[in-house]
Amino acid sequence: MVSPVTVVKSEGPKLVPFFKATCVYFVLWLPSSSPSWVSALIKCLPIFCLWLFLLAHGVRFLLAHPSASLIFVGLVFSAVGDAFLIWQDHGYFEHGLLMFAVAHILYAAAFGMRPLALRTGLVIGVLSGLCYALLYPGLSGAFTYLVGVYVALISFMGWRAMAGLRLVGAAWRWTELAAGGGALLFILSDLTIALNKFCFPVPYSRALIMSTYYAAQMLIALSAVESREPVGEDYRLSKAD
């Protein structure tokens, strides 16, 4: 098991560009009412930095570990989804929804199906059903089905992220904690989007959505550093190209 102190020392410097790009987004705070390619670039920049964060561990690392590669591709789809959502009021919300749906499928595949953790899945399934029931009165047309499918996909991703989470004992791994925390924050971010769009105005919605979203993506990217595939001895942070 890698200690949190080792994680901070090893991975912290690689995340500096991400933190700087996130600060740029919040400092500039470009108005969402005036979408442009500049605002799309500023919004996507932190995700681009997470691409670089994973690439900093070496292309051979990504090629050797399918879970890390899946998370990287998921980040690519997320950036495309972010760009689409810049123009969501111009008919591109569904496009963004599709991109993030694909990202969640990729993340779920990266987290794997072992252990199964059926009880965790049942709890998440019930909670996601309640969330959809809350959203349902505000949905109409195709969104009635699109949002339902999206809720199912992000809930499945959350289940797989938290299935292997162990907080005590020798089997504890910080990467599983990062995956579980990232999934929870992603669900919170997207639930806020849905409530704000379909149900009622959420105070400070944009700040809440983007802060939880960037934190979620960072944690999910961080979870890829220690591979989930057994390759001889456990993969350690010292491995780099």
From Swiss-Prot:
GO terms for molecular function: alkenylglycerophosphocholine hydrolase activity. Disruption phenotype: Adipocyte-specific knockout mice show elevated levels of lysoplasmalogens in adipose tissue and enhanced PKA-signaling pathway and mitochondrial oxidative metabolism in adipose tissue. The keyword Cell cycle does not apply. The keyword NADP does not apply. Pfam families: YhhN. Belongs to the TMEM86 family. PANTHER family: GH04784P (PTHR31885), LYSOPLASMALOGENASE-LIKE PROTEIN TMEM86A (PTHR31885:SF9). This is Lysoplasmalogenase TMEM86A. The lineage of its organism: Eukaryota, Metazoa, Chordata, Craniata, Vertebrata.
